[in-house]
């Protein structure tokens, strides 16, 4: 991808996503990763950072991942925010991840398997 880095925005309140990825062998040199440990002002944060990849935990305060996703997609539909190229649910709960996929996420993966996702191999 040349010298253009891909931008990753993660909403995850319990685990350091960068640490999970690096320990899983992902080379993050082409990625710019930003993690927020809560979902305060989440839509403003997405709008400011303009991520290529959005990672959403479900059980995170104050707004759960599923509600963040629904709200975000409403704003996208209203042309008020640019949709990230890929949105992944990264809950440890497969039921929560399935719910996010039904609501419009592009996919999901348990956060501890995240380093194995094909998105890092591009």
What are these regions (language model features)?
Residues 52-76:
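Conserved phosphotransfer microenvironments
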Residues 52, 77-87:
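His-Asp phosphorelay/catalytic-motif detector in bacterial-type signaling
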Residues 45-48, 118, 122:
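CheY-like receiver
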Residues 67, 89-117, 121:
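Alpha4 helix (beta4-alpha4-beta5 surface) of REC/receiver domains from two-component response regulators
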Residues 35-53:
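Acidic, metal-coordinating helix/loop segments flanking the phosphotransfer/catalytic sites
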Residues 28-34:
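A generic structural motif
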Residues 23-27, 45, 99, 103:
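Alpha-helical interaction/dimerization surfaces of two-component signaling modules
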């Amino acid at each position: 991808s040349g010298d253009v880095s891909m931008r990753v925005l993660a909403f995850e309140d319990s685990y350091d996503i960068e640490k999970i990825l690096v320990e899983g062998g992902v080379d993050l040199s082409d990625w710019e990763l930003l993690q927020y440990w809560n979902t305060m002002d989440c839509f403003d944060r997405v709008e400011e950072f303009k991520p290529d990849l959005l990672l959403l935990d479900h059980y995170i305060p104050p707004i759960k991942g599923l509600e963040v996703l629904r709200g975000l997609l409403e704003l996208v539909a209203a042309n008020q925010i640019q949709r990230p190229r890929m949105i992944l649910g990264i809950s440890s709960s497969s039921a929560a991840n399935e719910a996010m996929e039904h609501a419009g996420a592009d996919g999901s993966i348990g956060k501890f398997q995240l380093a194995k996702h094909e998105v890092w191999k591009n």
